[in-house]
């Protein structure tokens, strides 16, 4: 009986030692992206992409800085519109009806501030940010067997209240990169539904791997795909690029 108990205990220890932990998965993910030193050397990213809308190919330019400032510029029918803009204090975007820039409400701006440290990936320095990880049972999604991680970030504001900010990441077990991210929509007409972001076509740019295709959709629904054409890093930008016009 003692021998049987020892064998069972040994098998259990072997299983534990060989099992992946959430931290192991993130370490391999960061390494596969290019390594922490390389990622930390990046101060800015500019992506140029196109999205198909009603048969039209719409150009998009997205600029993000390590300090959290960001802006997306959309060219449509001869006009340029800004969306998702944040200058470190104010978040704003173009009103599609009036075609004039408008500041976002205080709640939206506060949520932008809270996620402004997620430059490149929320997983970079996640412990310093106070994020926590939980490894869940493996799942197959988009036809790929994946590690599933529950990522709890800083609380977000919804309808004036702090609520949990939880995302579920599905990491390809072979390449250790996320192929799907899911989150519950916290407010608005689609409150309670699950949003999905699907990543594919990872390519190397200056030693760092990026997904060159990204589809945003509701779970089990149709979505909008952005196809990236070029990515540049460490360009310098004037403060005015991100500022609300007139300030």
Task: Please provide the spans of the model-predicted regions.
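Bacterial Sec-dependent N-terminal signal peptides
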Residues: 1-22
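N-terminal mature ectodomain segment of secretory-pathway/periplasmic proteins
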Residues: 24-99, 132-137
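A generic structural signal for short beta-strands and their flanking turns/coil linkers
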Residues: 43, 68, 129, 165-167, ...
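Short Pro/Gly-enriched beta-strand edge/turn motifs at strand-loop
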Residues: 45, 115-120, 182-183, 196-197
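A short, sequence-level motif marking secondary-structure junctions
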Residues: 62-69, 87-89, 108-109, 201-203, ...
